[in-house]
Design a protein with these regions (language model features):
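Conserved C-terminal beta-signal and adjacent last beta-strands/turns
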Residues: 23, 445, 459, 504-506, ...
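Gram-negative outer-membrane beta-barrel transporters
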Residues: 343, 404-406, 410, 418-419, ...
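Transmembrane beta-barrel wall of Gram-negative outer-membrane proteins
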Residues: 176-178, 183-212, 217-255, 281-296, ...
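Short acidic/polar hinge/loop motifs at secondary-structure boundaries
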Residues: 88, 108-109, 116, 121-148
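N-terminal periplasmic accessory domains that precede
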Residues: 50-51, 76, 98-99, 116-119, ...
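Face-selective signature of the C-terminal outer-membrane beta-barrel domain
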Residues: 238-246, 281-426, 450, 520, ...
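Structural signature of Gram-negative outer-membrane beta-barrels, strongest in the C-terminal barrel
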Residues: 234, 340-358, 387-528, 611, ...
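Membrane-embedded beta-barrel scaffold of Gram-negative outer-membrane proteins
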Residues: 197, 292, 296, 302-308, ...
């Protein structure tokens, strides 16, 4: 598909030309996609986030939710659109596959995410078992901060993909009352009512949200409902605290993975096995309770502490057996920040501690749901196995930014990490147990140079560390209960040991403003050891194995450009925003696969939107997404096809900011394509069921009203 190569190439050329064309206009540095074209003076949280991200010696993104909310926003696919370096695609529900710099490259959509450290309002959401998605309700968000790769170091993030912080509204930036409703194709409906206010030294934000959809693919109906509340209090100018509460329930029918032939000819068809079993994935009620307290010692130093309780059970009916999973974590954080003078040079230091631990009840119970194979002859509900998931992550990190010359900052850092993982089969009694613990380290060295007010260059060399999930220790085992073990015959018996994944990454890049627009550009190269890769043993499997790979390479380019193409005398404006991600992930002389590409992600990923804003508040936009082919197995014997989709939006933002309406039209050509790929080992060139279909042509309409 020539277009999928020419547009990203043109974008990259423009971004490379930006330093030469930098003009003298003042600017705010950083990758920022703002919401409505006017910046609200009351949204100080977004402005503060821009300043923080400007000071990072590496690639970052800032998403102001005012822009995505001018269209359908149902999942992370909508929140993280048009973000360089971020791949986010949905399998038709909230279980979005997210990858940054190849993190969780072959994780299946709907599973707990890997390779990213995810936060809610700066507090840990990610636990030893990965990152659940059900609490990531987009309508609750004020903005999202993304620190790609090792650039999440000062947040305590040591994963390959970096850190993502979902920041919710508070009483300081929310309307006193807001009502939002959206509806559209495939039975989609979304409703929310929210309120936020500042009452003296106290403020609050409260929202109730629900959504439901029949789904594009057969047997992918979903529904959800949830509530969020946070309450803040300022005791005095030096001391403030905020409590956070989130609770949400989701139910998702599963259509399963299908073949390329099925997507081409019957794109809405589900995998027959999933339909016959009535497979589903329910989160019956996830709860997140946290507190963050900040004490400003003086104008130059502060201490912030955080505490979280996170309970997230699951009811998985994803095969012939039923798995009820209990997950509960507790987390604590401590951060000390200081700005002072070191050897006569301006210095900014951070010392942080992050601890997350599974509680003793974490584990799973597996029972017969549909008697078949080794469970034939046993009644539904018969216990098969009980097993435990235990783990903890402890990260102590120190970072410093030192201005060693005018506008030249040296970044140094060192983190120590202690990880513990344990899994045991407690029923039947002949089950095994595996326990692992490991100390590791992650240094960081970087430079950031403000060459002109409109041009910043940066580079860094960093190390990342990621431990396996406890569940992968049992599901990756090839040691099974022998014949004669009753209903447990053939089930994994002894958990296995896996090594921590580590990587050393070099990053170079820059960001700035020029005559062609606001731009960002980053190149990175990572040598990864013991990469934790997942593989489905066969096309009918529902749970992947996870294994340590031979050495791999992750390298790529991340570029964005936001341009004001034309301004009319009456105040109208024509703008273009573009994001391009080049990803080259491959083995290094693997004994079986040589230098094969790692499957699951495209090499080229481009998104662009051309938009005209009328002075009266109306807007109209057209958009496109171009994606190259994707390998579906480690042997690279078969590929999902490249594709291009096109869409358009129309809407109106009232000048007073009190109401808006929009029409979001997607995939106008009704293109049939694979949205996500969950890799197999070696399909020998056959068209195996590895892909989930992307949404066909669809239209959505929405309206919101606010009492300001």
């Amino acid at each position: 598909m020539p277009a999928s190569k020419s547009l990203p190439t043109a974008l990259l050329g423009l971004a490379l030309a930006c330093p030469a064309m930098a003009d003298a206009q003042s600017m705010e540095l950083g990758q920022v996609l703002i919401g409505a074209e006017e910046t609200s003076g009351e949204d100080q949280a977004v402005e503060d986030a821009k300043v923080r991200l400007d000071q990072v010696a590496g690639g970052t993104n800032l998403v102001d939710m005012r822009r995505p909310l001018q269209g359908k926003v149902a999942s992370n696919q909508d929140v993280l659109a048009y973000q360089p370096g971020v791949y986010a695609q949905s399998a038709g529900n909230e279980g979005v596959k997210i990858s940054i710099r190849g993190s969780g490259i072959n994780r299946a959509p709907g599973a707990h995410a890997s390779g990213l450290y995810t936060m809610l309002d700066g507090l840990p959401l990610t636990g030893p078992g990965g990152t659940p998605y059900e609490l990531l309700e987009p309508l609750w968000l004020d903005h999202v901060e993304v620190l790609r790769g090792a650039n999440g170091f000062d947040r305590g993030a040591l994963a390959l993909g970096g850190a993502v912080d979902y920041v919710s509204h508070t009483g300081y930036d929310a309307p006193r009352l807001q009502v939002r409703y959206a509806t559209g194709s495939h039975g989609y409906q979304q409703r929310q009512i929210s309120s936020g206010q500042v009452l003296g030294d106290f403020d609050y934000y409260l929202a109730v949200t629900d959504a439901r959809s029949d789904g594009y693919q057969d047997h992918t109906a979903s529904q959800s409902q949830g509530v969020i509340a946070n309450f803040g209090y300022r005791f005095n100018p030096n001391l403030e605290t905020r409590f956070y509460i989130r609770h949400r329930e989701t139910e998702n029918d599963l259509g399963g993975r299908v073949t390329k032939n099925s997507i081409e000819h019957t794109p809405r068809a589900a995998n027959p096995a999933y339909v016959s079993r009535d497979d589903s994935r329910d989160q019956p009620g996830s709860t997140f309770i946290g507190n963050k307290t900040t004490y400003y010692i003086d104008d130059d130093s502060s201490i912030q502490t955080g505490l979280v309780y996170h309970d997230y059970p699951m009811d998985l009916r994803e095969g012939p057996n039923r798995l009820k999973v209990a997950y509960s974590d507790v987390s604590g954080t401590f951060d000390y920040k200081r700005r002072d003078t070191l050897w006569g040079l301006e210095s900014r230091s951070t010392v942080g501690l992050r601890v997350t631990k599974h509680l003793p009840n974490a584990g799973a119970s597996e029972r017969v749901r549909i008697p078949t194979g080794n469970t034939a002859g046993y009644a539904p509900g018969t216990p098969i196995r009980n097993f435990t998931y235990q783990g903890s992550d402890t990260v102590l990190h120190f970072g410093n930014d030192l201005e060693i010359a005018d506008d030249l900052w040296l970044t140094t850092g060192l983190a120590a990490i202690y990880t513990r993982r344990e899994s045991a089969v407690t029923y039947p009694q002949s089950g095994g147990k595996t326990s692992m613990n490991d100390w590791d380290y992650a240094p960081r060295l970087g430079l950031r140079y403000q060459l002109t007010p409109d041009l910043q260059l940066f580079g860094n060399l960093s190390r990342s560390v990621e431990a396996p999930h406890p569940w992968s220790l049992i599901y990756s085992s090839n040691i099974r209960f022998p014949a004669g073990s009753g209903v447990a015959t053939g089930a994994q018996r002894d958990p296995v040991k896996l090594q921590n994944q580590t990587a050393t990454t070099l990053e170079l890049g820059g960001r700035g403003d020029s005559v062609i627009g606001e731009w960002s550009l980053a190149w990175y190269y990572a040598q990864v050891r013991h990469e934790l890769l997942s593989v489905l043993p066969d096309a009918n499997a529902t749970t992947p194995y996870e294994l340590n790979a031979s050495p791999t390479v992750h390298q790529g380019v991340e570029a964005s450009l936001q341009s004001n193409l034309w301004s009319a005398k009456d105040g109208g404006k024509l703008s273009l925003r573009q994001a391009y991600t080049f990803s080259d992930f491959h083995y290094r002389d693997d004994q079986r696969f040589g230098d094969n590409r790692l499957p699951g992600l495209p090499m080229h990923y481009y998104q662009g939107e051309l938009r005209y804003d009328f002075p009266q508040g109306f807007f109209a936009a057209v958009n496109t997404q171009l994606v190259s082919k994707v390998a579906v197995d480690y042997a690279n014997s078969y590929y999902a096809d490249p594709y291009a989709t096109f869409g358009a939006t129309l809407g109106y933002n009232a000048p007073k900011g009190d109401w808006q309406t929009w029409l979001d039209m997607r995939n106008l050509t009704d293109k049939h394509y694979a949205a996500t790929v969950t890799p197999g080992y070696d399909d020998k060139g056959l068209d195996a069921a590895r892909s989930t279909p992307g949404e066909g042509m669809a239209m959505y309409v929405g309206v919101s009203w606010s009492l300001l």
